[in-house]
Curated annotation (Swiss-Prot):
Keywords: Chromosome, Developmental protein, Differentiation, DNA condensation, DNA-binding, Nucleosome core, Nucleus, Spermatogenesis. Testis. Residues 1-60 are annotated as: Disordered. The gene is PRM1. The keyword Nucleus applies. Its main location: nucleus. GO terms for biological process: chromosome condensation; sperm DNA condensation. This is Sperm protamine P1. Protamines substitute for histones in the chromatin of sperm during the haploid phase of spermatogenesis. They compact sperm DNA into a highly condensed, stable and inactive complex. One of its GO terms (cellular component) is nucleus. Belongs to the protamine P1 family.
Amino acid sequence: MARYRHSRSRSRSRYRRRRRRRSRYRSQRRRYRGRRRRRSRRGRRRGYSRRRYSRRRRRY
C-alpha cells in the first residue's frame, strides 16, 4: 500500500508541472495569434508549411 501512495504523490507533482507549462503555452499562443493567422493560411494552401508548423508546435 505504501508503494501505491508514493506513486500517486509523484504523479500529482508531475501533473502540476505540466499544467503550468500549458498555461504558459496558451498565453504565448494568444500573443502570436494575429500575426500567425495570415501566414498559416497561406502556408496551408501551399502544403509545405504544414510540416514546419507542426514541428514548431511540438517544441512549445
